[in-house]
Amino acid sequence: MYLLFSKLNTVLHDPNIISIIIKTRNKQAIKQYISIKKSRDLMITVSNEIDFLLSKNKTIGEIVEYVSKKFDFIKYPIIWYSLIRKYHLKIIVETGVSMGWSSFMILTALQRENSGKLFSIDIDSSETVKREGGIGYLVPNHLKKYWNLVIGDTNKLLKPTLDELKQLDMFIHDSDHSYQTMSYEYNLAWKFLNSNGFLCSDDINHSNAFDEFISQHKHEIINIYIIEEIQRSSDDVNKRPMIGFLQKIIS
């Protein structure tokens, strides 16, 4: 109990937490709010650091390694944010949202660009995510004007989404990491990707779909990047996740 209320000392100025205390007196709701606020504050700090490093003309690789170590922060949201800010990407499609770490960072980048839209597709969330607030619960209301979230299977929803958009600047795969789904999403999104745009994927070492895609489209790719993720508690120590992103040739 002491730990909970010592944490409250840092947020009692926040009208939202005061409202929760008055209305519910629910310790779990208070702890959840504090946890979400802490995560959001960290992501804003990370975003600010990335912007500073971009202003110093640091490369994406330098930014990712420095920021992930400094803040003990997962790399893939750093990459997505950095690409959007560096290349001023506008139309983004992602498959897989979960809590919303990537979505928060992407939407913050679009807000700072003062334009653009994120189209996210995710199937029904896990029980843990549901308990915390549902798919994308880390995304605050003020960022949602840049966001179109659809709940469902990417195998059914990705094609109509892309057909409606007609083109995009960035595609991010982080849904089902089976060979079939990864290969399907990569090949479909590539058809709609603008020249100089990016095809990105988390967990590329779950199958050979990413390597196969590169082999099939190497004449259309200008840059290939592979980055090893930081070690996370849920990871197999012998199979650390790998992140990949490709830049399409400028036509």
Regions found by a protein language model. Give the residues of each.
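Short charge-dense sequence patches
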Residues: I22-S35, E49-G61, G133-P140, K159-K166
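Membrane-proximal basic amphipathic "stem/tether" segments
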Residues: M1-F52, I249-S251
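Class I SAM-dependent transferase core
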Residues: K37-I74, R85-K86
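S-adenosylmethionine/decaboxylated-SAM
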Residues: Y66-F71, P77-S251
